């Protein structure tokens, strides 16, 4: 396309981003390409604590996927603790409850565990993930934040942050 003189607006997702993409294309050929990828809520206090601990352990900042995975594990652990029994049906009944806005906002597993240990139920908890609030939609999917990235001068530049 580029070498033939055809100009088109290119769009992609996180799988289209990588150093090799730019290294393997002529300078300027990708300029203007826009990508949308999941984003962690940088600046959010519990995310920053998570990111600092991650960086201390691994020597680099975490990806958004690291934050999502962490929240998945915490949400699963809280569901297991809050459920009446360890079955798929029982866990499915409480997984949304431990993240509902009607509960008390908690930012760590330890805070949520304390509520359950004091006789509270899943309904009493609103776990706020390191990846942002975890409010499941009608399909059971968590809402998330996105970053819009544009290739400028043959480099990736974050141009916009959108909370879902």
Which residues does each PLM region occupy?
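Extracytosolic ligand-binding ectodomains
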Residues: 1-164
């Amino acid at each position: 396309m580029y070498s033939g003189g055809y100009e088109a607006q290119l769009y992609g997702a996180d799988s289209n981003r990588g150093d090799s993409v730019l290294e393997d294309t002529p300078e300027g050929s990708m300029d203007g390409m826009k990508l949308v990828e999941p984003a962690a809520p940088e600046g959010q206090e519990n995310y920053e604590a998570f990111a600092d601990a991650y960086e201390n352990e691994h020597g680099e900042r975490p990806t958004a996927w690291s934050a999502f995975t962490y929240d998945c594990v915490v949400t699963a652990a809280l569901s297991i603790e809050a459920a009446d029994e360890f079955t798929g049906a029982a866990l499915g009944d409480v997984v949304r409850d431990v993240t509902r806005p009607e509960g008390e906002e908690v930012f760590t597993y330890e805070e949520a565990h304390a509520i359950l240990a004091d006789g509270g139920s899943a309904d009493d908890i609103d776990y706020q993930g390191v990846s942002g609030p975890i409010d499941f939609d009608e399909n059971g999917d968590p809402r998330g934040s996105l970053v819009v990235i544009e290739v400028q001068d043959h480099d990736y530049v974050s141009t916009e942050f959108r909370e879902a």
